[in-house]
Amino acid sequence: MRTYAIRPVSNRLPGPIEPKKHRRDRDNSTTGSLYNALIHPVQGEKTITSTMIRVAEFQPFLNTISVLQVLAAIFIGALTYRLIDAFFLSPLRSIPGPLLARLTTKRANVDTFSGKVTQTVDKDVARYGDVYVYKPRAVCINHPDDIRAVLGSQEFRKAAFFDIFNDGNTPNIVSLREPELANRRRRQLGPFFNYAYLGRAEPLILQHGYQAIRTKWDALIQANSGRPTEVNYRTDTQLVTFDIMSALAFGRNFNAISRGSSSIMKWAGLIMEMLESPAVLALLSLLPFSLIMRPWKIMYRELAAFSSDAVDMRKQLLAEDSTEKPLDMLQAFIDAEDPESKIKMSPHEVQAESIMMMLAGSETTSSAIMWTFHLLLLYPETLRRAVHEVRSAFSLNHLVTYKDVRSSLPYVEACVYEALRHSPTTAGLTPRISHSTGITLQGYYIPPGTEIYVNLRSPSMHPSLWDDPARFNPDRFLDSDNNKRLLFTFSYGPRNCLGRNLAWVEMLTIVANVLKDYDIALTEDSLFGPHCTDENGLPVLMPAKCFIASFPAKPERDCRMVITRRMAGVKACAREYSPC
């Protein structure tokens, strides 16, 4: 057997000729030595030993470096980069704002998910003005003129945030971002939401709205031997608006008010909170956090199946008897056609719109009614005046309609307007963005690609529009159509709330009929009332959380009131309050 030996003449492998300097550098390097050790086992032991000695020389230094020090170095490097970007590179560097907001989105995300975004924004506006940095590449705007400029322009589209409202891959009227598609959908759905169509659907709205409340409350009073009875006006108005929307959107009824609860409604409220934070939703999609969302996913699948079945049942009904179509939202959506393109919605689009209308429409409307009752209870003189108006105009057995309120109850209507101004149900921030057009607001140039967060609450409390804005004063809206146009509760411009007319029918009929038929008062142990005031002498509102809508933080504690059935010829009595 022939044997071979590696000649120790050269330690180079065959290949291109290298410059002498490069060979010397390579052969003298640690890497080169290890490379030689692997190729030349005779020389390898000496080479490895030499390398280990050289590494050992640095061991004391390596021992001093901990994981925490490495992380600290990374943090300092990242912070330095963000500081340089925020103060020297960012196109928003000349706009005032909190330091933390310039460096990270975490500040905004924490406030949003905690429901404290309104309080934080109010403090920021007082310190930085009507335009300030909200995130590293986003601003928050608060002046009414600026809000009109942004929301009134098709250039500023809804930001990617709204994708979370999609029904899977199917967008709806809330989440559509392309102006052309959004305009087509509004043309398809618009006919249902005009007052002429809603007037025909009003009996259904009253049946599942105020009449359902009256049935429940009368039963509670009867069970209590006719004595004053405690109810929760947040829960009950939430249940009936949910029933209204389910009847209109699906042609079917959950009967939530008669059962006293609805699991779907509770999960709907929870998801409305979670939808405000895409980061949290992303986290909840991962194990083990995804287990938290399993009940909601099951509910949503059931709701989607419920919606799909409703569409199929309606089509079957029409196939059997098409002489008279039901007057509800479901039928309107099935028949909906864009008058320009003649395009109808697909079954998936009908389902997406029905689900969104039920989830969003029920929560926001019930929130508005809840704040109206809360403010009336805080201002007893205003409550007495509203009660006197409605009881002077209509008898006990008269069911007040939307038309009745508009024609005969201007003060009751003004109370609802003022509640929407004082405590707007849509009090969060809504983001817009333009990738092609910049805009100058309050002297600051906002370049294309910047997210603009619109504070819909700010115009309702802005001193340029309202005197003494913190005071609940319905007189602002008496004989003042201009003030009514100043409200931003239903947004503004081409993407304003399509369902606002339906909301008005629900709000006015429920509030007016409750004031006509019941004496309402705070419970004896209520923490918030006219007896507990702030430094300006104004009643303190119950604490609230603001997500997509504004909700009470503790509804079980703070949304209780005592009701007494009004008897013919008996005047309401006013409770006396003592200072807290």
Swiss-Prot record:
Q: Which GO terms describe its cellular component?
A: membrane
Query: Per UniProt, which keywords does this protein have?
Result: Glycoprotein, Heme, Iron, Membrane, Metal-binding, Monooxygenase, Oxidoreductase, Transmembrane, Transmembrane helix
The record lists heme as bound by: C497
Q: Output the InterPro entries linked to this UniProt entry.
A: Cyt_P450, Cyt_P450_CS, Cyt_P450_E_grp-I, Cyt_P450_sf, Cytochrome_P450_monoxygenase
User: How does this protein sit in the membrane?
Assistant: Single-pass membrane protein
Required cofactor names = heme
GO terms for biological process, alphabetical: helvolic acid biosynthetic process; secondary metabolic process
- What triggers production of this protein? Expression is under the control of the secondary metabolism regulator laeA.
Q: Name one Pfam family in it.
A: p450
What the protein does comes down to:
Cytochrome P450 monooxygenase; part of the gene cluster that mediates the biosynthesis of helvolic acid, an antibacterial nortriterpenoid. Protostadienol synthase helA cyclizes (3S)-oxidosqualene to (17Z)-protosta-17(20),24-dien-3-beta-ol (protostadienol). The synthesis of protostadienol is followed by several steps of monooxygenation, dehydrogenation, and acyl transfer to yield the final helvolic acid.
Q: What is the protein named?
A: Cytochrome P450 monooxygenase helB1
Protein source organism: Aspergillus fumigatus (strain ATCC MYA-4609 / CBS 101355 / FGSC A1100 / Af293)
